[in-house]
Amino acid sequence: MSKRDYYEVLGVSKSASKDEIKKAYRKLSKKYHPDINKEAGSDEKFKEVKEAYETLSDDQKRAHYDQFGHTDPNQGFGGGGFGGGDFGGFGFDDIFSSIFGGGTRRRDPNAPRQGADLQYTMTLSFEDAAFGKETTIEIPREETCETCKGSGAKPGTNPETCSHCGGSGQLNVEQNTPFGKVVNRRVCHHCEGTGKIIKNKCADCGGKGKIKKRKKINVTIPAGVDDGQQLRLSGQGEPGINGGPAGDLFVVFHVRAHEFFERDGDDIYCEMPLTFAQAALGDEVEVPTLHGKVKLKIPAGTQTGTKFRLRGKGVQNVRGYGQGDQHIVVRVVTPTNLTDKQKDIIREFAEVSGNLPDEQEMSFFDKVKRAFKGD
C-alpha cells in the first residue's frame, strides 16, 4: 500500500508555513492520540500524522520530500544518479570488495555497541505543562542479567567461538554474477551474527544476557512544555551491548485540553462572556488566568469579538525566552428566559432606539446607557 502525501495527511497546502503545519499536527495528534481515541486504526493514523510532521517541520527533510516525495533518489539507476541499488541479491559493495579486495569494513560482532533508545508517552494536565513538575515514571526495559553478567552463559561456563564463522559473525557466500564468481558476506545464521555459541545457557535469562524489568526514573518536566514535545534522558534506554553505552529514553508529552484555556505557543487564549448590560455600560470583571484572578476593566460599548491582552500572563517559554501573554475574546451573551419586566424594558429600549440604523441620531450604546440609567 502506497504512502499518503504528507501534506494531505496534515490537511495543509504545499505552501503552508511552519506555524500552519504545527497547528495542523497538534490538532490531529490530539484527535488520534491512542490515550484519547480508542477507535480501531487511530494508532496508525497517529503514527502517520507524526511521521508527516517530522518530515514537513524540518526544512531539509521537507525540501527533500518536495523534490522526491516518498521515493529514495539514491536507489536504482534513474533520476538521482547511480546508487547502491539491489542487483540480483547482492550489493555493489560486495562486488568491488571481491574484485579489488576493498569495500566496506567488516564489523566486529564483539565490539561495544550502544543500547536501543526507548520512548515513553506522558500525559500532562494543562497546568503541569505550563508550570512543570517533578514526577516518577516506571518503564519496562531490559537490564543486564546479574547471574551471568550479560554473557548469556551458565555461571562457571563461557560462550564458545562459533565454528561456522570463526567468531566473525559473518559467512562468505559465493555467487555467480555478470562479473564472474564473487563472494558476498552474510550474517552467520548459526550464531545470529554474534560470533559466539552458548551451549550452556543461563537459567535466569535463557541465554539472552538480559532480563526484562520495570525501572523507576525521576523526571523533571520543564515549565512550558507543549503537546508533542519530547524530553531526552541520556543513558536511560536499553543497556549497551558488549559493554557499550546505554541508549536514551525519550519522554513524549501529551497535554490534555483545558475546559477554559487554549494554548498557541507561549500564549493563552480564552473567551470571556459578558452580559448585555456589562457590554453596554462597561464594568470591571475578574478574569481567571493560570497565575490567579486578574481584574479587567471593560469599557462601555464593548462588542462581541473585542480582544484584550494581559501581558506576561501566558506560559513561560520552555527554552527560557520570556513569558507569553493571555488573550481574552469577549462574547456578549444574549439574555434568555426573560421576565415580563425585563421584556418591557427591552421593548421600551427598542422603541427609543428605532429599528433601522439610519433612524438613530446618536450611537447605539449611548442609547443603551440612557435606557438603563433611566434618562
UniProtKB/Swiss-Prot annotation:
Superkingdom per UniProt? Bacteria
Start-end of the CXXCXGXG motif repeats?
Answer: 145-152, 162-169, 188-195, 202-209
What switches on expression, per the entry, is described as: By heat shock.
Q: How is the cofactor bound?
A: Binds 2 Zn(2+) ions per monomer.
Q: Name one GO biological process term.
A: response to heat
Q: Which residues bind Zn(2+) 1?
A: C145, C148, C202, C205
Query: Which cofactor does this sequence's record say it needs?
Result: Zn(2+)
> A Pfam family name for this chain?
DnaJ_CXXCXGXG
The yes or no answer to whether the keyword Nuclease is present is no
- A single MF term (Gene Ontology): zinc ion binding
- Sites binding Zn(2+) 2 sit at C162, C165, C188, C191
Q: Quote the cellular component terms of the Gene Ontology held in the record.
A: cytoplasm
Report the coiled-coil segments.
Answer: none
Q: Where are the zinc fingers (CR-type)?
A: 132-214
Is Cytoplasm set as a keyword in this record? yes
Cellular location of this protein?
Cytoplasm
Main subcellular localization, coarse class? cytoplasm
Domain spans labelled J: 5-69
Keyword vocabulary terms for this entry: Chaperone, Cytoplasm, DNA replication, Metal-binding, Repeat, Stress response, Zinc, Zinc-finger
Per the entry, what this protein does is: Participates actively in the response to hyperosmotic and heat shock by preventing the aggregation of stress-denatured proteins and by disaggregating proteins, also in an autonomous, DnaK-independent fashion. Unfolded proteins bind initially to DnaJ; upon interaction with the DnaJ-bound protein, DnaK hydrolyzes its bound ATP, resulting in the formation of a stable complex. GrpE releases ADP from DnaK; ATP binding to DnaK triggers the release of the substrate protein, thus completing the reaction cycle.
Task: Indicate the family of this protein.
Answer: Belongs to the DnaJ family.
HAMAP family membership: DnaJ
Query: Subunit composition?
Result: Homodimer.
Record comment regarding domains: The J domain is necessary and sufficient to stimulate DnaK ATPase activity. Zinc center 1 plays an important role in the autonomous, DnaK-independent chaperone activity of DnaJ. Zinc center 2 is essential for interaction with DnaK and for DnaJ activity.
Name used for this protein in its record: Chaperone protein DnaJ
